[in-house]
Amino acid sequence: MSFLFFSKPSLSEVQHLVNLETGISILDVFQMSYAEWHGGQISPFSIGRFHYKPVWEASYIQRDESEIVFDPGVVFGSGWHVTTITCLEALERIFQQENISSAIDLGTGSGLLALATAKYGCQRVLAVDLNPLAVSTTWFNIRENGLESRIMPCQAKAEDNVGIPAELLMANIHYDVLQRIVALEEFYLKKWFILSGILRSQFFELRELFRTRPVHIEEVWNEGQVWYTILGKIVS
């Protein structure tokens, strides 16, 4: 399944393109609002020491250091999904304990985790996504927050970037990709990790795997026994 996004009504143009091809026709039309696409209205929220605001509600005249502004565009990352919220809470836990100087955000979406990590003081953050729309959206949000010197967006497969040296690895991503990530020895060279996008049965699979590896699970979030987020540390 594929989606095309338009900034204005475009049915006539689409119909014209369809008419140029044989064997193709429009079967149905469903109009979805921007809020429906994201699963609800996008509004400000606060987690830990930061306030997250969509760009259309942020002040360009007076921003304080606790503000992170973002535009999710049409990619995942409105901030309201429970996996995003719990990942941000996990980040707060890490930075309450120590400073992190390098991090990788795999499946960055709109870049919220990367933005927060850099705002906490992390000097080098690699924000990776296979979706080019996510990369361009993240780059926009990086510039909006003046974090160009700290975050580098990259279009690539998540598992191809696990080997890049970093103290922290974050991955809020499909479970099939997570499985490939944790199967790599390079994963266990990190100091901290945050994994999310995990369902109940998948969490138990990961927990059993980590019992055989040098991993200490610091905290687990399991909102409604549906979505799980794991904050873990590699034991050297």
Model-derived features: positions:
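N-terminal auxiliary segments of SAM/dcSAM-dependent transferases
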Residues: M1-I61
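Short beta-strand micro-motifs in enzyme catalytic cores
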Residues: S2, S66, V226-I230
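Hydrophobic anchor at the start of a short beta-strand
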Residues: I24-L27, V125, V215-E218
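A short helix-to-beta-strand connector/capping loop
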Residues: I24-S25, G48, D64, Q123, ...
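SAM-dependent Rossmann-like transferase core, predominantly class I methyltransferases
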Residues: W37-Q97
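Conserved SAM/SAH cofactor-binding pocket of Class I
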Residues: S78-A158
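S-adenosylmethionine
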Residues: L130-I234
